[in-house]
Amino acid sequence: MKRTYQPSKLVRKRRHGFRARMATASGRKVIAARRARGRKRLSA
């Protein structure tokens, strides 16, 4: 059986990267929430 996690740097960046987050209103909310918490890494 194939495992569910098949790592790919490109897919990771496209789905969870900073630019992907900034592209939607809810994504911008995610970034804002992570900034408010003081996260060192905002996105993938």
Swiss-Prot record:
Does Ribonucleoprotein show up as a keyword for this record?
yes
GO molecular function of the protein, one example?
A: structural constituent of ribosome
Q: GO cellular-component terms in the record?
A: ribonucleoprotein complex; ribosome
Top-rank taxon, per record? Bacteria
A Gene Ontology biological process in which this protein takes part is: translation
| Pfam family for this entry, one | Ribosomal_L34
Q: Which PROSITE patterns is this protein grouped with?
A: RIBOSOMAL_L34
**Leader sequence segment:** none
Q: Which UniProt keywords apply?
A: Ribonucleoprotein, Ribosomal protein
Name the NCBIfam families for this protein.
rpmH_bact
Q: Which family does it belong to?
A: Belongs to the bacterial ribosomal protein bL34 family.
- PANTHER family in the cross-refs: LARGE RIBOSOMAL SUBUNIT PROTEIN BL34M, MITOCHONDRIAL RIBOSOMAL PROTEIN 34 FAMILY MEMBER
| Name listed for the protein in its UniProt record | Large ribosomal subunit protein bL34
